[in-house]
């Protein structure tokens, strides 16, 4: 019957989801516990550049907060 395809469909769905989830965890691990940010728009790029300058270590994913602002 039609429901015999469900196990194969479930396996295929899991195989398609694993790379996306694994990529998110790898980015989170390599970027100091934060997810990877992408500056596709000019505004996002400016925010990343601002965070890079404010961090004090030239990395956008290291946040130091307000104590670094002069």
Curated annotation (Swiss-Prot):
Its keywords, alphabetically, are: Electron transport, Membrane, Mitochondrion, Mitochondrion inner membrane, Respiratory chain, Transmembrane, Transmembrane helix, Transport
Task: Tell whether Metal-binding is among the UniProt keywords.
Answer: no
Under InterPro entries, the record lists: NADH_Ub_cplx-1_asu_su-1
Report the subcellular localization: Mitochondrion inner membrane
Kindly indicate whether the keyword Kinase belongs to this entry: no
| One Gene Ontology cellular component | respiratory chain complex I
Superkingdom of this protein's organism: Eukaryota
Residues that span the membrane, as ranges:
1-21
Specify the protein's topology with respect to the membrane.
Answer: Single-pass membrane protein
Purpose: Accessory subunit of the mitochondrial membrane respiratory chain NADH dehydrogenase (Complex I), that is believed not to be involved in catalysis. Complex I functions in the transfer of electrons from NADH to the respiratory chain. The immediate electron acceptor for the enzyme is believed to be ubiquinone.
Please give the family membership noted in the entry. Answer: Belongs to the complex I NDUFA1 subunit family.
Q: Which PANTHER family match?
A: NADH DEHYDROGENASE [UBIQUINONE] 1 ALPHA SUBCOMPLEX SUBUNIT 1 (PTHR17098:SF2), NADH-UBIQUINONE OXIDOREDUCTASE MWFE SUBUNIT (PTHR17098)
| Quaternary structure annotation from Swiss-Prot or TrEMBL | Complex I is composed of 45 different subunits.
Q: What is this protein called?
A: NADH dehydrogenase [ubiquinone] 1 alpha subcomplex subunit 1
Say which species the protein is native to: Cricetulus griseus
Q: Which gene encodes it?
A: NDUFA1
